[in-house]
Structures are given as structure tokens and as C-alpha cells.
Design a protein with these regions (language model features):
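ABC nucleotide-binding domain "signature motif"
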Residues: 6, 52, 207
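Eukaryote-biased recognition of intrinsically disordered, low-complexity regulatory segments
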Residues: 1-9
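Fe-S ferredoxin-like electron-transfer domains
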Residues: 48, 57-191, 200-210
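Extended, non-catalytic structural segments that build the interaction scaffolds
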Residues: 9-11, 143-144
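N-terminal cofactor/phosphate-binding cores enriched in small/glycine residues
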Residues: 13-70, 79-80
Length: 210
């Protein structure tokens, strides 16, 4: 581990090279939007909302998985980044059934907060209106796949903190979904300890108590 000096949004900053740019930015009060990141869990770079511009690199890089390097020049905000983040929120909103007025997470939803923060006033792309399962088989909790944004927080907190390994990811692309056990009803999965950690970390109304 060594100390490097880099520039973030015009500020010269020292950081350890085993940190992520997201950690470095947070330490210095620079806010970067995220959806899949959660302190204490390993980062997967799934939501792509924390993308940054790095001078000399044509591709945008995820702050949660990129390490600082000596002399690196980073921009966390620009017209290009704001447009990109707003488009991601648009796609997330259109791919699921996110009807805020009737959602249990209305008023405390991270997706809703990000839409407001990025200035998203309306969704320009067609809504898919998918018909997804609502799993109410668990005695204490409900999983509404219509509002899942595939951040995988539930999967990671169940694996890394609780050690129950109840949740997993199945399929790819638009068919990708979170499954319990071997694609069973949640209430039938013996590994679930009913701890509620997955519900606590869900950023939307996909997981909620009965």
C-alpha cells in the first residue's frame, strides 16, 4: 500500500492506492451518486451511476471499482456524466413497474431520490410494463420483482454479512432476475434466517415487511 496524489474536480488529494475512487471522494466530501454500492459490502459496479471521467481515458470508469493512480485527473460531474446518469435512471424506470404513488417505498426510495437529483422530469423511452412475480410466500417479508433494479445488495448482504446464501441471480439481459434458493418461493427456502437484512438494504420497494 502506498500513497498517491491525484486531482478530483480540481482538488489535489492524497489517497492510498488500495482504496477506490468512490472511497477517496467520500473521504473528501465529494458526493458521487450510487445505487448498487453499500458500505461494508464488496462492490460490483452494477448500476453504473458512479461513472467518472478520467483524463486520458476515453471510456468512463466506475468509481466503486477503480483504484487511484499517481497523477490521475478525475471529474465526477459534467454535462456528459449528468446526461448519462439521467439516462440510466430512465432505463431503470422504464424496465420495471415503478409507480411511486402506490409504492411502499414512496418518499424513501433511492431510485426516486436519484431521479430528482438528476433532474429527470419524464421518461422518454417506452415503458415495458413487465408482468413479474410478487413472492409473498415468506411469513414476514415480500419480494416484488416489479420494483427490483438488480442492484444485488440483497444477494451480497445475505452472502457476506448473514452468511445464509439465500439469494442469487438468474438469467441474463432483460430476463435477469433475483431468485431465492434454487428458484423457489422465498418462504420455502430453508437457508433464510428471516434476519431482514436484505429488506433493510433494498434501495427501492422490491423487498418490504408484511
Amino acid at each position: 500500500m502506498s500513497v498517491v496524489t491525484l486531482t478530483i474536480d480540481g482538488h489535489a488529494i492524497s489517497a492510498h492506492d488500495d482504496q477506490t475512487l468512490l472511497q477517496v471522494a467520500k473521504e473528501h466530501g465529494i458526493e458521487i451518486p450510487t445505487l448498487c454500492h453499500l458500505d461494508g459490502l464488496h462492490d460490483v459496479g452494477a448500476c453504473r451511476l458512479c461513472l467518472l471521467e478520467i483524463e486520458g481515458t476515453p471510456r468512463l470508469q466506475a468509481a466503486c471499482t477503480t483504484r487511484p493512480q499517481e497523477g490521475m485527473v478525475v471529474r465526477t460531474t459534467s454535462e456528459r456524466l449528468e446526461r448519462y446518469r439521467r439516462t440510466i435512471i430512465e432505463f431503470l424506470a422504464s424496465e420495471g413497474n415503478h409507480h411511486c404513488a402506490v409504492c411502499v417505498a414512496n418518499g424513501h426510495c433511492e431510485l426516486q431520490d436519484l431521479a430528482l437529483r438528476t433532474g429527470l422530469e419524464y421518461v422518454r423511452v417506452p415503458y415495458l410494463y413487465p408482468s413479474r412475480q410478487l413472492d409473498a410466500s415468506h411469513p414476514d417479508f415480500v419480494m416484488d420483482h416489479n420494483r427490483c433494479v438488480l442492484c444485488t445488495r440483497c444477494v451480497r448482504v445475505c452472502d457476506e454479512v448473514e452468511g445464509a446464501h439465500t439469494w442469487d441471480i438468474a438469467n441474463r439481459g432483460i430476463a435477469c432476475t433475483i431468485i431465492a434458493g434454487l428458484n423457489q418461493p422465498w418462504g420455502n427456502v430453508d437457508s433464510c434466517t428471516a434476519c431482514g437484512k436484505c429488506v433493510a438494504v433494498c434501495p427501492t420497494g422490491a423487498l418490504f415487511p408484511k
